[in-house]
Amino acid sequence: MKELTHIDPLIRQYDAVFCDVWGVVHDGVQVFESAVQALKKIRQMGKSVVLLTNSPRPKEDVVVQLQMMQVDTECYDEIVTSGDVTRDLICSVPRKVFFIGPQRDLVLLEGLSCELVEEGEASAIICSGFLEDLEAIPEAYEGMFRRLRERNLPFICANPDIIVHCGDQEIWCAGALARLYQQLGGEVRIAGKPHAPIYECAFKKLQKIRGIVDKNRVLAIGDGLLTDVKGAIRFGLDSLYIMGAFIIMIIVTMVL
């Protein structure tokens, strides 16, 4: 691993960047303007930028969120969300689903042939986050998950992140619930980072922008070792691990 203080010499080796959003572009409260300017500069160098986020919501919702936070649209070419690639997983499970997450995330199911049912009627579980009427800690779900596990219901996790920092606060994410369900012996299915589907989708979108691109010409940027870095290594990409500020980075050499 090599510590970097400037992105220019490194980025010249690549044709494109897959960049994380939460923790790199913003922290849920404030935008990291230095990161936005760096991404704009990367595009000005003739490179393509695809934002990869474990948000459980569709791309269109993330675009609106970034606009509301006044993130310059010139800092990216395309966006791929965990929510979008998770929809394919949802189509692979039985129709009757028990949804765990805030009401705003139900947009994840729009247009799909799902029937939302109560816990006792469900044939599968879709999780985007924590319920609004339960304490937002994983332990509060153990009893429910033991009941669901006894029925061998598959658990689809739309946001694999375990925890995120929202300003000065730490917030548990759906990945923490998926981890608990798996620890109880349940079957968990995930399409977001660090798993292949989100990278495969991003690569297809990148090739629509640039034509044929070699993986060794794509750099992944993120602040999550277990999501961004692990996913990049699995997919065969070089990665930059963000530590604090955008320009203080460590390069993680590609592992084949």
Q: What are the roles of these predicted feature ranges?
A:
Residues 1-21, 26-47, 52-80, 84-256:
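Asp-based, Mg2+/Mn2+-dependent phosphohydrolase catalytic module
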